[in-house]
Amino acid sequence: MHPRYEMPFHWHMEFELMLVLSGEFSLLIDGRSYLLHKGDAAIISAGAVHGGTPSDCVYECVVFDMNRFLGSGSVCQAKYNALFERGAQIEPYQPAGSVTCQLIDRLFEAMEKEPEGYEFVTIGLMWQLFGQILLQHSYTVSTSGNKRNDRSTAQMKAALERIRKNYASRITLED
C-alpha cells in the first residue's frame, strides 16, 4: 500500500488480516484503538467496524471469507461455528515475533511469491492461524457488559451505510 493510504471506516462480513511492513498505523476497531509498528499484525473479525491512519507506513491487507475454508460438516467447521455463533471476537493486536504474527507474515509471503503449491500452503497457514488463536484463547465471547459497545457499533454501521448509499445526495441533520 502507499505510505499515506488512509483506511476509511468500513466493515464487511469477512475477516481481514493486516501486516505493517514499515512505519506506524493507528487502527481503530469497534471503538478500541491499537498502534501497530513494523512487524505487528492485526486480525479484524468479520463484521467489525474498522479504519485507521498510517504514519509513514506501508502495510498489507487481505480480506477472506472463513466459510470458504471450512468443509461442510467437518470437525473444524463445528468448532468454528460453536465459537463464532456465540459472538466471539478475536484479539486484534498480534505483536511482531508472536506465533500468530509469524503465521500471518508467512501467509502474505506465500501469496506474494506464489511458489508451486502456494494455494495449499496458504490454506494450511490459515488453519494454523485459527488453531493458534484457539490454543492461546486469543478471543473474547460477548457478555452483557459488551452489549453497550455492540449497540454503539450497530449505530455506527447504520450511519456509515446511510452515508455510503446517499453519498451523492445532500444529507442534513434532520435526515
Model features per residue range: what roles?
Residues 36-49:
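Conserved metal-binding segment of the jelly-roll/cupin
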Residues 1, 49-112, 131-141:
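A hydrophobic/aromatic-rich effector-binding and dimerization subdomain
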Residues 88-96, 111-122, 130-175:
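Short, Lys/Arg-enriched, Trp-marked, Pro/Gly-tolerant hinge/linker segments that flank
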Residues 19, 27, 42, 62-64:
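Preference for bulky hydrophobic residues occupying beta-strand positions
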Residues 13, 46-48, 173:
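Short beta-strand or tight-loop elements
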Residues 34, 51, 60, 117-121, ...:
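Short, surface-exposed helix-loop/turn micro-motifs enriched in polar/charged residues
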